[in-house]
């Protein structure tokens, strides 16, 4: 499915903003350094200084390209990804859905748009290093702007210690969240919690970086059925894919 239209005043943030800014910084320093070297040596060493400038300009171009792709992934790519992930849940419209690591509400709001009588809960610790402008208030403002504030709520919560009862949700979804936990043990705890609160027969869909193969193993060990891995994608310039499973 193509990316669903969003309200003009909705902002789902830039993922890992310091990293994107760092790549822009590398581009600037590389180009600036090359120009300075060329300017200081252009008369005495015209050929070598020009070659150094060309090499550093190429480095700057690559760094700027990486930064651009990270921004593009955050502004457009993740909207397309959202619809692909939600399609895998095959929502009827009456489900209770949990979004783990909801950020500014991208997946939670997308799921709420597909519901009629169902409800979505998004949880996060809202770390600003993970997403620009990351806060519960920003998520609520986005939900209001998208017209789904009555179908979605946002709670402060730890993915490793979910406060919800067993078999409470019909579907669980998460994107770019679990890799921010400290280590494999912590990620395993979060995966087990996600399955615990999922109803039998419910579906879980997780998108993340290269840890996904391990996620699939943990889900199978916990008894999940129909565990499938998608093809790799390179949004945000890093190999990522989704895992879908049924409890």
Residues of each region from the PLM?
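Conserved SAM-binding loop of SAM-dependent methyltransferases across substrates and taxa
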Residues: 104-116
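A short acidic, Gly/Pro-enriched loop at the edge of an enzyme's catalytic core
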Residues: 92, 160-172
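A short glycine-rich, Lys/Arg-flanked "PGG" loop and its adjoining helix->strand segment in the class I
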Residues: 187-200
């Amino acid at each position: 499915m193509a990316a669903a239209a969003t309200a003009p005043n909705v902002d789902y943030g830039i993922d890992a903003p310091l990293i994107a800014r760092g790549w822009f910084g590398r581009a600037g320093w590389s180009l600036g350094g090359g120009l300075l070297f060329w300017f200081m040596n252009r008369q005495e060493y015209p050929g070598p200084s020009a070659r150094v400038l060309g090499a550093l300009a190429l480095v700057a171009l690559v760094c700027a390209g990486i930064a651009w792709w990270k921004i593009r992934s955050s502004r457009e790519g993740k909207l397309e990804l959202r619809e692909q992930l939600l399609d895998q849940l095959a929502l009827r419209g009456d489900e209770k859905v949990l979004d783990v690591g909801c950020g500014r509400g991208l997946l939670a709001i997308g799921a709420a748009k597909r519901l009629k009588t169902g409800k979505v809960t998004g949880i996060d610790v809202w770390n600003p290093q993970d997403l620009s402008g990351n806060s519960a208030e920003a998520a609520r403002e986005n939900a209001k702007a998208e017209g789904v504030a009555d179908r979605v709520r946002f709670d402060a919560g730890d993915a490793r210690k979910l406060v919800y009862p067993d078999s409470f949700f019909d579907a669980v979804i998460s994107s770019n969240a679990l890799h921010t936990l400290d280590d494999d043990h912590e990620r395993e705890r979060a995966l087990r919690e996600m399955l615990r609160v999922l109803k039998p027969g419910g579906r879980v869909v997780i998108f993340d970086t290269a840890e996904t193969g391990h996620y699939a193993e943990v889900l199978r060990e916990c008894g999940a059925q129909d565990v499938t891995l998608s093809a790799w994608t390179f949004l945000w310039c890093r190999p990522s894919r989704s895992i879908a499973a049924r409890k």
